[in-house]
């Protein structure tokens, strides 16, 4: 109905195309004049366009000429001319919209148009892909176009960065693949300074986080986030929207508990009921030890299960698993249950070389470097008998949703976006425009066939493969898991059918296998959408046959002469053209889906592998009542009852439009459910995103060398004002109530800020006859004098360096603690719904309070350390920078995380190091974090010397024990502290019993300015 009214009123998808058509006609009219230009004149057009921009013209003014120039450059360099529909796609991308272009319509070529146009501003453009291979190949393929027009293009990956240089030949690259040979290695910064940069979503996001952990401007690599085109935009902005990018460092956590609970949960049995059934049937005491909620992938223990766990853990009678003393155990129990009963090997992950590797549920690809968060990955490792790695603490994090929304202009392209247009509009403010195909689509999409059992379904799939293979039609079989692909592979082997398997275990051969999936008689089994981004050409890809043809002739490709390679290329073209003609006559590529995905879009992507550029093709999905989607979300009972009433045999399918509509209805419900979750994620993450923006902007100002002297003195003035209010209280309107004053306590507290304030500069006797304001002014004047004295002693330039380093160090330290607190808050906030409160509003309120405390803690860190640190500034700066280098090392090793990313190993010392809030073992009486924190090597040397002296004194010969790890216990989330204050060293307390650092914030800065 909505589509009908859109069409009637002229607001449908065709409207945008009609508005663009006059621009396309203008571009076409310029083609003859542009064709007449020489290469030098074509290149000079770039300088002309830049000058016209400087003179006041807009990119829209330049668009027709710029697109005509790019089209001609493409024809001259790579032999491809943009079709009119590709020009339409380019215009849509320039407008900051999403272009839905079907498979094979040339998205890589389309992107050159808006990238060139927007790069004319000199502010940089990014092309975002889903993997390093596509980024490098796409940029290398289009590189000659940009080079002819005088623009630079670079590519980045986790391992390298390189810039396109036609005069450079990479000795390690395949010499026959021109897309890969001209990549000259360069620095990361140089790659971002290129006019156009290709890379993956992970690398762009991680570079942003690394830049915001840098301690020197020279470490920054990215420029402003100006314009980006996201390839496979639905995969990155929807499928991976809930996957945060996390840079983490190691926490100190033992794996023993994970192994213990992995064994314990195997004694538990699942309930036969779902939560919905328990609710509908009002079952008070369900069978089994736990109930699985499939939608949220969570598990809830029954009363019987709780009792069994308490027996297994030997919890004394009268005590409960949920008592505070046992609370930390629920963390391990929950993860062990999910690992054992929800996460399945060869579906959600694989075990390879003693490592648990996550499998992408949408693409079926392995994701090395990614780790589930909050202990889940360690629980899966324990389940599989793999040594659990240390848990990590978050150093920096951002979601793809918030990263890509920072670009001033964002566009995207994919073959399947229209079904998700509402989400793109509401979350990213992106409109989806469906681009017409160059040739009409003639693929046949048959109705689904549904069977009672999974066994009958797979037998039917094999029969269909056999029929297609017998006549020579290529077949691509899409599966949803590694397990299914290997099951089908075994069945085909037993029938003697030659085939290729493409799944998470073999993705290294992905592009090559997919490229040949269109050859006559080819059978390819692909996990979900593996190979996305690689075209399937009917008859096969000739480039992929060259090595095979040479091998048949007894020639290794690296030893072949140019003449032999050319002969092999001709032979490959002849073979693929002949096979392509035969395959078209047979009906083209046939797609078989073995299970419906939760999202219609993923199913459409699989179908879209056939029927490219007007080629023939067909598709059909085979389902069973035992499939996950139907069991979890579909009306399985109704369909099963219908089959029983009709007396349908297990081996006979139901094939009807009604079934298709029923399944699509289930998919629509799931899509809506997942959309709500992602929208919910954005609403919560937006809270932290605003705070992250404030912190990162503050950090950047410090990094760029802004003079922080006045700001530091204002912070000190605030703290002094707060101390004056604490120690010299006003009483019922009387400003100077000397009986309640503790001037000695005030002086002691102030000396923790400025150790130079001895009796000659500031004493209780000097202050006891002054008013409160006069005392505050006298203290600040004395501190400012000492501050100036320190500047003269070490030099103003060095003092500015100390200020910047101290402020960056304080921000980073407190930000890490804050992120941990926010994670805990996010986990516990759902309980607010039980109290009839809106969790989002409560989250916003708590987050605001935590952020205010974060800022106060940062200020305290700086105030109580800046003057003392200036005495050993060189040594302290070395130690602080060494700590930052450790964090940056973790950042360089970071990969995308479904939760926590890999981090560096924790360094174990031969002496025990205290927690940050524990007394420093050096004997100073100060807390560790304001004494030897950041100077661990010095402390270790001191303690080791003491151990040696003690051993010598008692003639003992016992070796030093390894340092115990930081405690693994976690208090209940309601008790987790929100950030960590940085109080001054321990001193005699004021009458209230509170330390000076706990004094409330005051108005000292404003008073000082007066």
UniProtKB/Swiss-Prot annotation:
Cofactor(s) required, per the database record: Zn(2+)
EC code: 7.4.2.8
GO terms for cellular component: cell envelope Sec protein transport complex; cytosol; plasma membrane
Signal peptide: none
Biological-process GO terms, alphabetical: intracellular protein transmembrane transport; protein import; protein targeting; protein transport by the Sec complex
Keyword vocabulary terms for this entry: ATP-binding, Cell membrane, Cytoplasm, Membrane, Metal-binding, Nucleotide-binding, Protein transport, Translocase, Translocation, Transport, Zinc
UniProt feature, compositional bias: Low complexity: 893-904, 950-981
Ligand binding (Zn(2+)): 920, 922, 931-932
Cofactor note: May bind 1 zinc ion per subunit.
Binding partners and assembly: Monomer and homodimer. Part of the essential Sec protein translocation apparatus which comprises SecA, SecYEG and auxiliary proteins SecDF. Other proteins may also be involved.
Protein's name in the database: Protein translocase subunit SecA
Organism: Roseiflexus sp. (strain RS-1)
Gene: secA
């Amino acid at each position: 109905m909505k589509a009908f009214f859109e069409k009637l009123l002229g607001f449908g998808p065709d409207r945008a195309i009609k508005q663009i058509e006059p621009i396309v006609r203008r571009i076409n009219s310029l083609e003859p004049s542009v064709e007449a230009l020489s290469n030098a004149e074509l290149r000079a057009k770039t300088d002309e366009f830049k000058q016209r921009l400087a003179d006041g013209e807009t990119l829209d003014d330049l668009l027709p000429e710029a697109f005509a120039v790019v089209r001609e450059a493409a024809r001259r360099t790579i032999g491809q001319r943009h079709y009119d529909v590709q020009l339409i796609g380019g215009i849509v991308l320039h407008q900051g919209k999403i272009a839905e272009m079907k498979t094979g319509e040339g998205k890589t070529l389309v992107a050159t148009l808006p990238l060139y146009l927007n790069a004319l501003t000199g502010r940089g453009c990014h092309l975002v892909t889903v993997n390093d291979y596509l980024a490098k190949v796409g940029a290398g393929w289009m590189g000659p176009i940009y080079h002819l027009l005088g623009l630079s293009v670079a590519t980045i990956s986790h391992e390298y960065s390189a810039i396109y240089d036609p005069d450079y030949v990479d000795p390690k690259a395949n010499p026959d693949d021109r897309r890969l040979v001209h990549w000259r290695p360069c620095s990361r910064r140089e790659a971002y300074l290129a006019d156009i940069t290709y890379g993956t979503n992970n690398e762009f996001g991680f570079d942003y986080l690394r830049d915001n952990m840098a301690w020197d401007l020279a470490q920054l690599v990215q420029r402003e986030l100006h314009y980006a085109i996201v390839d496979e935009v639905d995969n990155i902005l929807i499928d991976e929207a809930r996957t945060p990018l996390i840079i983490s460092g190691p926490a100190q956590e033992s794996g023993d508990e994970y192994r213990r609970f992995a064994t314990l949960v195997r004694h538990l049995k699942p309930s036969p009921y779902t939560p919905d059934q328990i609710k509908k049937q009002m079952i008070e005491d369900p069978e089994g030890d736990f109930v699985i909620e499939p939608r949220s992938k969570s598990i809830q223990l029954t009363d019987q299960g709780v009792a069994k766990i308490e027996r297994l853990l030997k919890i004394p009678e009268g005590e409960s698993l949920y008592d505070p003393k046992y609370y930390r155990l629920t963390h391990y129990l929950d993860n062990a249950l999910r690992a054992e009963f929800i996460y399945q090997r060869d579906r959600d992950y694989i075990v390879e070389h003693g490592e648990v590797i996550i499998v992408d549920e949408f693409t079926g690809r392995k994701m090395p470097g990614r780790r589930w968060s909050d202990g889940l990955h360690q629980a899966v490792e324990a389940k599989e008998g793999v040594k659990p790695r240390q848990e990590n603490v978050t150093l920096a994090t951002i979601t793809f949703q918030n990263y890509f929304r920072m670009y001033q202009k964002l566009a995207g392209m994919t073959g399947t976006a229209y079904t998700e247009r509402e989400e793109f509009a509401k979350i990213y403010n992106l409109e989806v425009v469906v681009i017409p195909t160059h040739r009409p689509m003639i693929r046949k999409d048959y109705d689904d066939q549904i069977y009672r059992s999974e066994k009958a379904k797979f037998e039917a799939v094999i029969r269909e493969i056999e029929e297609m293979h017998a006549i020579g039609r290529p077949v691509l079989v899409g599966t949803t898991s590694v397990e299914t692909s290997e099951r089908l592979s075994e069945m085909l082997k037993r029938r003697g059918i030659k085939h290729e398997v493409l799944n998470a275990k073999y993705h290294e051969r992905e592009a090559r296998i997919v490229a040949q999936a269109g050859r006559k008689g080819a059978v390819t089994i692909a996990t979900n959408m593996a190979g996305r981004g690689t075209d399937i050409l009917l008859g096969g890809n000739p480039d992929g046959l060259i090595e095979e043809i040479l091998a048949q002739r007894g020639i290794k490709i690296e030893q072949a002469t140019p003449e032999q390679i050319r002969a092999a290329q001709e032979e490959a073209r002849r073979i693929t053209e002949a096979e392509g003609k035969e395959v078209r006559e047979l009906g083209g590529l046939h797609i078989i889906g073995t299970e419906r995905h939760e999202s219609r879009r993923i199913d459409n992507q699989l179908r879209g592998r056939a029927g490219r550029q007007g080629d023939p093709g067909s598709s059909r999905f085979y389902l069973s009542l035992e499939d996950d989607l139907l069991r979890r979300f579909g009306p399985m009972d109704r369909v099963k009852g219908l089959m029983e009433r009709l007396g349908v045999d297990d081996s006979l399918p139901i094939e009807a439009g009604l079934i298709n509509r029923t399944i699509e209805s289930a998919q629509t419900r799931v899509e809506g459910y997942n959309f709500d979750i992602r929208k919910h994620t954005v609403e919560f993450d937006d809270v932290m995103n605003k705070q992250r923006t404030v912190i990162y902007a503050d950090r950047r100002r410090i990094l760029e060398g802004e003079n922080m002297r006045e700001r530091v003195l204002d912070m000190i003035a605030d703290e002094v004002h707060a101390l004056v209010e604490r120690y010299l209280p006003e009483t019922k309107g009387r400003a100077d109530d000397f009986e309640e004053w503790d001037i000695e306590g005030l002086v002691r507290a102030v000396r923790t800020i400025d150790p130079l304030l001895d009796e000659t500069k500031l004493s209780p006797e000097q202050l006891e006859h002054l008013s409160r304001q006069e005392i505050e002014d006298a203290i600040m004047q004395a501190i400012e004098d000492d501050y100036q004295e320190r500047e003269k002693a070490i030099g103003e330039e060095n003092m500015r360096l100390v200020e910047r380093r101290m402020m960056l160090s304080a921000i980073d330290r407190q930000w890490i603690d804050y992120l941990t607190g926010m994670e805990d808050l996010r986990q516990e906030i759902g309980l607010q719904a039980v109290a009839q409160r809106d969790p989002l509003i409560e989250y916003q309120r708590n987050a605001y309070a935590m952020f205010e405390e974060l800022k106060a803690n940062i200020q305290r860190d700086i105030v109580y350390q800046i003057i003392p640190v200036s005495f050993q500034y060189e040594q302290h700066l070395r130690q602080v920078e060494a700590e930052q280098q450790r964090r940056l090392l973790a950042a360089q090793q970071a990969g995308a995380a479904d939760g926590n990313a890999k981090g560096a190993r924790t360094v174990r010392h031969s002496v025990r190091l205290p927690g940050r809030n524990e007394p420093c073992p050096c004997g100073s009486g100060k807390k560790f974090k304001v004494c030897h924190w950041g100077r661990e090597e010095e402390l270790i040397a001191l303690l080791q010397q003491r151990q040696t002296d003690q051993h010598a004194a008692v003639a003992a010969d016992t070796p030093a024990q390894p340092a115990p790890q930081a405690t693994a216990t976690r208090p209940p989330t309601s008790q987790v502290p929100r950030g960590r204050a940085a109080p001054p060293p321990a001193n005699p307390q004021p009458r209230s019993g509170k330390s000076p650092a706990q004094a409330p914030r005051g108005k000292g800065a404003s008073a000082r300015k007066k």
